[in-house]
Amino acid sequence: MNPQEKELNYPLGDRLPLSGERYDLREDVAWLRMPLPFALDHINLWLLRDRCDAREGWTLIDTGASTPATRQSWLKLMEAPEGAGGLDGLPLLRMICTHMHPDHVGLAAMLAERFGCALWMTVGEYALCRILAQPPSAEHQAQLLAHNRSLGLGSPPSQPLGARRDEHAFHHLVPALPRHFRRIRDGEAIRIGDRDWKVITGCGHSPEHASLYSEGSTHASDPILISGDMVLPRISTNTAVWEIEPESNPVRWYLDSIRRLEGCAPLTLVLPSHGKPFVGLHRRIAQLCTHHAQRLDEVRQACATRACSALDLVPILFRRPLDAHQLGFALGEALGHLHALWYDGELARQFDADGVVRFRARTPEAAVAPEAKCAFEATGGSNAPAASKAAGGFEATGGSSARLC
């Protein structure tokens, strides 16, 4: 347990459900734990007792990835006799997916077909999932290569990215998605069993992530937050820039989003997607804000002495060994922190002739937010907007042309 974890309260101690078995937290709330084929080796799913159209059953929060191990765990749950830690013979009445990442939505189509249940999801998550679940095209592969080159990996990349290995590709972990869904929206109240759950959306980790907050049942105050990936007890949520949205500002969006959760009651039981249920939401939010502030300071210091690519920052921000899969996320997160300072006007962005994008500190008098100084980017100085020229325009680096923005 790291020092920050000691500031949180884990009411269940070290108890964990076995894969494919239900662990009851309340009469109406149960915990499932499914395997993942990564260093982060599990995901938590949640079963909520429900009634829909006079039918008794479950509402499922997230599904697990489409892997043989997870499908086997679901088979075990469905076949378990009543009272043996399975579904007790009750159907899934609906699925609510917090967001579109494969470990959260990968088996939605299989479960929808098995139980005839609807998928509930925010429209931003559903739409992006439909795009990413398609087999990659030649155009997308070219886009990905260009993005990897911009990170500093070279073309072809000099280092393998396990996140892009075929067996871990998005469309393999999400082989299908239900053709229709029911949209959920920020602030909406969803009645599940004897509880009302308020939808609280956020971004930075994904486009329109939905957390669910209940103040309690009709019988008692019992605040619970199903936080998804927005607040995790042991690790920080990935806030990465990806090739599909290369101009994003995920770190700032994420920090704004988690502060919205401070309206939850102080003794809220947090049910995260990874790690153990905990109490101490407000303390954990403060820890995460401090963590990102420290990382931004490290980026400032690195860029004060030289122009840095995302790859340059990985050993500075991540001091532990990374496997190939983790490297992909680390690169995206390094770029996310660079973008935060670039959007704040603290860094200048430089496009080098080798395709690598680097960032360096601006002088105080030249610190202009990119929205004001960069209406668009051009490959030649003649098309650069006046604001961009005033802020530095184009520089020569090592004898080669470099664009600044």
Region roles according to the model:
Residues I96-H104, C203-H205, H209, H274, ...:
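Histidine-centered divalent metal-coordination motifs
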Residues N2-P11, L16, D297-C374, F394-C405:
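C-terminal regulatory/interaction regions
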Residues C52-A54, L153-P160, G216-S221, T363-R403:
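Intrinsically disordered, low-complexity terminal tails and inter-domain linkers enriched
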Residues S19-G83, S211-M230:
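Conserved beta-strand hairpin/beta-sheet module of binuclear metal-dependent hydrolase folds
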Residues F38-L40, R182-I184, C203-S206, A353:
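A short catalytic or substrate-binding loop motif that flags glycine-/basic-rich loops and adjacent residues
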